[in-house]
Amino acid sequence: MLKILKESLKTAPIVKRGTYNYFIHPISDGVPVVKPELLRDVIACIVKNADLDVDKIVTIEAMGLPIGASLSQITDIPFIIIRKRKYELPGEIAVHQATGYSKGELYLNGICKGDRVLIVDDVISTGGTLAAVIKALEMAGAEIKDIVVVIQRGNGKKIIEDMGYNVQTLVTIDVDENGVQVLGCIDDECK
């Protein structure tokens, strides 16, 4: 499991954003192309490992969308998209998020008090986006049953764990000017 994801990460191009080595990958960026077999690889691993006894799947715009939509189709669990755009619907919750390379507002709609949710996202690096999502879900009165992120890079997972939540990550990577190194994965087949 995850062979396609691991191999695709090892060949991901690297670009500099200031001093930040940014990897470009179909799961995290949607370019150059998101191949169905890559998405199937990722979704199969999430289905195998996530707590799916939930009312809703929560994902974050933009690259959480293919993950959330695919997972929703497979599991028949509805999904909610946390957007970067305000809709001004009743009950909308706005939270500020900051990442390693951007900041802005996120908007949560469609969550009711008591909803049991699974959060899925593409990458965790600084933990800024996920921390903001958790804060919004807590404000809405949701019960966060599980958090699954495809790619872990950096110390963001520890930040979320310090908030009292476990984060399952499918693969852990390091990125430098030479490329992406896969350091570990949710199954023991990474070595």
UniProtKB/Swiss-Prot annotation:
The keyword Heme does not apply. One of its GO terms (cellular component) is cytoplasm. Gene3D superfamilies: 3.40.50.2020. It catalyses: IMP + diphosphate = hypoxanthine + 5-phospho-alpha-D-ribose 1-diphosphate; GMP + diphosphate = guanine + 5-phospho-alpha-D-ribose 1-diphosphate. One of its GO terms (biological process) is purine ribonucleoside salvage. Pfam families: Pribosyltran. Keywords: Cytoplasm, Glycosyltransferase, Purine salvage, Transferase. Pathway: Purine metabolism; IMP biosynthesis via salvage pathway; IMP from hypoxanthine: step 1/1. It is found in: Cytoplasm. Its EC number is 2.4.2.8. Disulfide bonds: none annotated. InterPro entries: HGPRTase-like (IPR026597), PRibTrfase_dom (IPR000836), PRTase-like (IPR029057), Pur/Pyrimidine_PRTase (IPR050118). PANTHER family: HYPOXANTHINE/GUANINE PHOSPHORIBOSYLTRANSFERASE, XANTHINE PHOSPHORIBOSYLTRANSFERASE. HAMAP family: Hypx_phosphoribosyltr. Catalyzes a salvage reaction resulting in the formation of IMP that is energically less costly than de novo synthesis. Belongs to the purine/pyrimidine phosphoribosyltransferase family. Archaeal HPRT subfamily. This is Hypoxanthine/guanine phosphoribosyltransferase. It comes from Methanocella arvoryzae (strain DSM 22066 / NBRC 105507 / MRE50).
